[in-house]
Amino acid sequence: MTVPDPPRDPDAAALVARGADAVSFLALERAMHHWRDAPPPAGTGALVAYADTGSAWVAAGGPITADPDQRAPAAARFVAAAAAAGRRACFFATESPALGGCNQLLLGEQPVFEPRAWPATLARHRRLREQLRRARAKEVRVRRVGPAELVDGSPLRAEVDRLAGEWLGSRRMEPMGFLVALEPFHAPEQHLYLAAERGGALVAFLSAVPIHARRGWLVEDVLRGRDAPNGTAELLLDAVFTHARDAELITLGLAPLSGPIAPWQRLARWLTRPLYDFRGVRAFKARLHPVRWEPVWLAYPRGSSVLRHLIDSLRAFASGSLVRFAARTAARHPGVPPWLLAVPLVPWTALLATIAATGNVHLLAYSRPALAGWATFDAFLAAVLFRIAFRPRARWLATVAGAAGVDAVLSVAHRIDVGFGHGPLQIILRAMATAAPLVGTAALTWAALRASFLERSQPP
């Protein structure tokens, strides 16, 4: 299958036909805003698709221009236009090694496959062939689906919507927007759709969009149901390489926080493991044996804070407030509260151990042995919470909530006995020591109830 012609709409045609970044086509999604520069010679004629967070314009990839040499000037003009509107600006998921006036932060890498090399890849890797064999042995069949089968109200559309809801419900975080919004039906005539069926029932679905300027495809969504046999995802991707055999490349998109990232990014990857399996995403894409990995960047104006632009980007994905997004995620996903409690418990435990070791036990009005025992208990609790965050089970959460409840009762009783002290440091530390177990007990109790509800809702 060749890459289709761009849409007939002139603006959309200019956008998708010139875009070389893998995410360029996603600019057609409903939530995107478009900035168009003045045509030459007054401007560059560039198009930039972006999300407006209220304080920043976060672009989807780099500027799209007829002349690649105009990308850097277009980036500068977009930043200036954002500033005139009272917004910061950055470019998320650009593949350009440099944009004029911008610094770059490596976000991760994306795998690149060449369809013509796929048969040789299969021939070299027995495990990959075995995955395909498993799915076929379970009578999974993949077929290409046309837009007419996916119109609103059609049986297949209803099945895909069901699969999407099931898939989103299995995620550890709330659904996100911007470049990862689940919107497979925009510009359907441009998509490559594949359905994996078993016994006439849909078990997985794949959507790919063109990268026109590189004669390639981006696999934007792979939805896999609970009943999909092992190897179903690989069978879908094998079908992509077959149907798009005339393309120059196919990519599965960004594997975030992978590749030669900075130490602080590796720490962030480790800390957020219960929320997003960064290593698992990279491992899945790697086991298909791409011909190469390409870097993907965040570009932001020189002299500005990279942290601020990262927060802007996260707000674009959260479709608003990060606090509200975190609250929704914590309320609905039982693995999140134990993780949110475990992370601050690590420095708190270190503080308790330091106070015990230095003899400053008057700060919390405990004896040194009691404080050392408390630090040991909290260290064990943090380890258990991290473990539960990966596999939240109602029984485990209820047990830990009970332990936190005992800690809360003892802490409140101790505070009633010795008071909050006199100096600011004593008051702050003792207030934290009293409030934390109470908050933890409430959060873990909620998580246990939520996990119990989800476990009862699972099909037998």
Task: Annotate each predicted stretch with a short phrase.
Residues 4-58, 87-99, 103, 116-134, ...:
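A conserved beta-strand-loop-helix scaffold within acyl/acetyltransferase catalytic domains
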Residues 363-373, 420-434:
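Non-cytosolic membrane-interface motifs at loop->transmembrane helix junctions
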Residues 347, 369-389, 399-409:
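Core segments of alpha-helical transmembrane spans in multipass integral membrane proteins
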Residues 351-362, 410-422:
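Juxtamembrane "helix-exit" motif on the non-cytosolic side of transmembrane helices
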Residues 378, 396-416, 433-440:
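Hydrophobic alpha-helical membrane segments
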Residues 435-460:
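Membrane-water interface at the C-terminal end of transmembrane alpha helices
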Residues 341-376, 380:
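Hydrophobic transmembrane helix segments
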Residues 328-344:
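Cytosolic juxtamembrane helix and N-cap/initiation of the first transmembrane helix
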